[in-house]
Amino acid sequence: MMPSESGAESLEQPAAQVGTGAASAVATAGAAGGGPDPEASSASLGRHQSRLSWPQVKRLDALLKEPIPIHGRGNFPTLSVQPQQIVQVVRSSLEEHGLRVHSVRLHGSAASHVLHPESGLGYKDLDLVFQMDLRSEVSFQLTKAVVLACLLDFLPAGVSRAKITPLTLKEAYVQKLVKVCTDLDRWSLISLSNKSGKNVELKFVDSVRRQFEFSIDSFQIILDSLLLFGQCSSTPMSEAFHPTVTGESLYGDFAEALEHLQHRVIATRSPEEIRGGGLLKYCHLLVRGFRPRPSTDVRALQRYMCSRFFIDFPDLVEQRRILERYLEAHFGGAEAARRYACLVTLHQVVNESTVCLMSHERRQTLDLIAMLALQALAEQGPAAMAALAWRRPGSDGVVPATVNYYVTPMQPLLPRAHSYPTWLPCN
């Protein structure tokens, strides 16, 4: 999932209703071929691209065919949506309304999972990127209207569609609507709700300055050939007969980025361009066992990310909202025990690398992180709560169930009362 950028504008205006005769969508894509040819791959592709192997293509096909529930609010029924179905329906409808889609791509953690599922990161959101032209406000509004109208095609049989409007569908099934329209960024995002956090995120991109934070999340997989193969071929895929699927790395070097993913290496380019959420992703990777590349200036990298975090989220209330939302999205269910480890790591990074705040602002943020860490520790049970010292968790992110009574004195986890007065904003 990609968070709202600075300057993002919510798409809240009601959209005109668009026809829904797109259930039998046919996506236009490159011709599907047989198995990958290594020699052809090396000769025809740049360093930022690579052909997917047969096991990777199988994982991609299974991911696109796995039904994902889109949960409705109130009395609206749950929709069962296969990613490949909604891509085909939306793409066909967009092109019927004069909006040409250049390509459709799988982006982010899901693409990384397809390429190397043993990384330990898994994936939550399913990021589907539609590369297209968005040159006017009309294009943005038409894109939103098309997606909302296409949701009608996925309503269960027997549900009356007569009085359902696009505004009703937005309120029922859309978790987030974002529009970014600046000189360098022109894109919109429609996120469909899923209670377990596996949201289907449809992103419509004309241009964007940066779509990745680190090399390991810079992958995009072009879906066009696989989608076309599924529509046109009656023969099941096999190792000897399957479409040629291409992956790209926005980091710039596909092989290097894949090696980073396989060996749990944190690397990036132009760290000053990383958005505010990159700090949380960095701490997340550290907790998962990733480590910065030896040649990385870690202190400079952390300073860039801390500065950007406080530029994008200057308000303490907003910081808490972002932290809680990130923890819920990435450390839910069985992963909840890792929240404490992530917050301990975040506290350490902010404490060591923040140079852009006044001292009282820095203390307020550190106290907020400490409070959330204490809550996460309490959720691990009474035994964990017995250790209220600031202690580094084990490699699995879990505080040991048995806590020794003798604890070496360390920095306390509980926030201290500060003597400074409440600061009021200047007029």
From Swiss-Prot:
Highest rank taxon of the organism: Eukaryota
Q: Where does the UniProt annotation locate this protein?
A: Cytoplasm; Nucleus
Q: Name one GO molecular function term.
A: poly(A) RNA polymerase activity
Q: Which reaction does it catalyse?
A: RNA(n) + ATP = RNA(n)-3'-adenine ribonucleotide + diphosphate
Q: Signal sequence: where?
A: none
Q: Name one Pfam family in it.
A: NTP_transf_7
Q: Which EC numbers does the record give? A: 2.7.7.19
Q: List the disulfide bonds.
A: none
Sequence similarity: Belongs to the TENT family.
Q: What is the protein name for this chain?
A: Terminal nucleotidyltransferase 5B
State which gene encodes it: Tent5b
